[in-house]
Design a protein with these regions (language model features):
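A general structural signal for well-ordered secondary-structure junctions
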Residues: 25, 74, 115, 150-151
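Flexible mid-to-C-terminal extensions adjoining Fe-S/redox cofactors in radical SAM and related proteins
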Residues: 103-110, 117, 121-181
Length: 181
């Protein structure tokens, strides 16, 4: 996945061309998560907060996405660009919401129902963006899944969850159509 942010959003078309030149099977895009503690960082700001688009860049990003859809329509149609036009258009809307200019895009996600995240240090999360439910250094995975993950899933409601409402990654899948197939 390619994370689009303040420093590279204008280069999205060039990123597609680079992916082709590298003979990759495809390319996928995601907005930068600047608000959670995902990926081993503090949620209290820091360097990752600087990745958000400035309010004055949001309209330009929307234009960049529309240009991408026009110039790379074949790549979208063939699936080389993995996102649909609607999902690509969510990217500038996400940054608009982050800047207080719009509502966050609707999220339809079930990642915590079909996957878990195990970080390099053994931390286990229900998805990349939610708080840890435990650590492999303190409990075996089977116990974490059967106890802590089950407890998380019982109380989790993606329609009202604050983390889900501001999530950059709206994953809706099933075991039969999982992204790794």
């Amino acid at each position: 996945r390619t994370t689009l942010h303040r420093l590279n959003f204008r280069d999205v078309s060039a990123l597609v061309e680079h992916a082709r030149a590298m003979a990759l099977d495809g390319i996928s895009f995601l907005a930068a998560d600047t608000v959670t503690s995902a990926f081993g960082r503090s949620a209290a700001g820091g360097a990752h907060a600087d990745l958000a688009l400035a309010p004055c860049d949001v309209a330009e990003f929307a234009e960049v996405i529309e240009a991408l859809l026009a110039t790379h329509a074949d790549d979208v149609q063939s699936g080389f660009i993995l996102e649909s036009p609607a999902r690509l258009r969510r990217l500038p809307q996400y940054y608009a919401a982050l800047a207080g200019l719009d509502a966050y895009p609707e999220v339809a996600c079930n990642a915590p129902e079909v996957s878990i995240v195990i970080e390099a240090d053994g931390t286990v999360r229900p998805c990349f963006f939610h708080a840890p439910i435990g650590s492999l250094r303190q409990a075996p995975l089977q116990r974490l899944v059967h106890e802590q993950l089950t407890a998380f899933r019982r109380t989790w409601n993606p329609d009202t969850d604050v983390i889900c409402g501001r999530c950059v990654c709206s994953l809706r899948t099933s075991w039969r159509s999982a992204p790794w197939h």
